[in-house]
Structures are given as structure tokens and as C-alpha cells.
Amino acid sequence: MADFFVGICRVLSALSNKLRLYNQTMQILEPYIPKEYLALKINYLRQKLAAMPEVTKTKRVIRGKKLDVYIVNSRIYYSDSKTGKELQLEYIKRDQLKCELLKLESTWNCYFRGMVPKDIGPRKITRRLYRSVDDAVILNSDFFECLKNDADPNYRESKILFYNGTYYRSAAEVEIARFYTENGIPFKYEPEIWLNGLKYPVYSDFVILIKELDLCKFHEHFGMKNSANYNRITATKYNNYSGAGLLPELDVFYTYDVDGVPFDLRTLSTKLNSVIYDSLFIP
């Protein structure tokens, strides 16, 4: 019995040491702010706001009743009218975008100062994935919406970590999902993807949508294992994506795990910034 309790204490001590190491690591890490991606998001919101009508709001008393009044192009619309209700939604949406833009501009001023470069602007970029020699699909928001989240039927018992409605296979995947969620980047986890040359689907770790470019990116997260078999699987994934017309570090980017070391999200942030910035120069 004494040996049993000694064993339990050793396990708890080991877990405590790992937790302390993790906390110390997290305290050391400073957030990496992706400069080009931040500029793209700011210019995207500025463009959206510029395209929206300038709606102002005030109040008036009509027959003893206070009503919200919306003014656009010097014309007045009451909130109980059809147009007034539409303008109310437009006013709320515009206000939300302005608040989001203010936060991003504050981050820019805090870390970079100066003018936001205007050449890093939103636009539609066309990239294609080949599902067969004669079947190509554009990697845009329509493609993204057709993907099913968490579609991989294999080894579901290994998904034991829960975050935001989905079970993940590793702590690093949870951190990646949290990163995308908190940064407002839509993503699908392990969606089913058909690639040219394959008779079976693959399940990418993450497919993300860059709304500002209407463009999808594939993100594979690998464990760094000293295993020849694992390395062969990794090499096969590289080749499968290339055979479907996807370029490494442009259409597909990769991150890696190191045993015993918490995944550093600065790595993901740097990679993401790089593939987005490179995409801006695609003709």
C-alpha cells in the first residue's frame, strides 16, 4: 500500500512539474502580431465601411411617443417604418464594424505606429484545387461552406480534448482552434477533401477561410516523431497536395509539434502572416 501511494505522489509531482513548465513558458511568450495580416484586416474593414451608407441616429417625440430616427442622405426615416427598420440594422452593423476597426487600429498604433500601408488591401484571389484532371474547384467561400466540419470517421476514440463543441486529438490542435476562433478566422476541422490522383478522401487538419481575400488555406499540424513510418506519411501528404495543384507554404502550410514542449502560437501566427502576404502578389 505504501508503494502505491509513493507511485501516486511521483505521478502527481511529475504532472505538477509539467504544469509549472507550461505556465513559465506561457509567461515568457509575447504575442506575435502579424503586421501584414493586421494591415489587411484594417483595410478590409475600412473598405466595407466606405461602401456602406452613412447612417446617423437621433430621437424625436411623435404624438407623445419617443421614436428612434435614422438619417441618411439628409432624409429622415422613423424606426417604425419599413425603411427605418432596415436602416436600424444597417446602423447596428456599421457601429459593430467601427468598433472592430477601432480595436484593430489601436493594436496597430500600439505595436507599429505610422500609416497602415494601403497596398495591402482586400481583393479576390483565385486559387484552384484539382479533384481530378478535368475537375477543379476554386478555393473560395463557396468551397469553404460546402466542407463538413469534423468529418474524419477514423480513430475517433483518440479525440479526447473538447473545445467549443468539437473534440480534438491533441492539446496543440485545441490551441490552434482557439487561435482561429479568437482571431475571427473561420475554419473547418478535419473536413473531407478529394484530391487529384487519389481514390479516397483525405482529412486536412484545418481548412481556414481568409475572408479579406475570399481564399481558403490548408493547415496541417504534424507531430515531430523519430519514426520512419511517420515521416513517410508526412511525405505522402506533401505529394498528395502537390498533385492536386496546391503549392506548399502558399496554399498549404505546416506546423509541427515537439514532445514535452507547449506549442508556440507565434509559429502559427508567423506562418499565417507569410502565406497571406505571399498571396497578395499572385497575379
Please annotate each region the language model reported.
Residues 1-142:
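Nuclease-adjacent, charged terminal/linker segments that flank catalytic cores
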Residues 118-186:
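Solvent-exposed, charged helical/coil patches
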Residues 160, 203, 207-237:
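Short beta-strand-loop-alpha-helix junction that forms the active-site gateway
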Residues 166-168, 181, 186-212:
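Active-site metal-binding core of divalent-cation-utilizing nuclease and nuclease-like domains
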Residues 171-175, 198-201, 236:
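Short, well-structured alpha-helical interface segments that form or flank functional binding sites
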Residues 180-181, 238-242:
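Class I S-adenosyl-L-methionine
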Residues 193-201, 227-228, 258-263:
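Acidic-and-aromatic substrate-binding clefts and catalytic sites of carbohydrate-active enzymes
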Residues 243-283:
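Basic, glycine-rich
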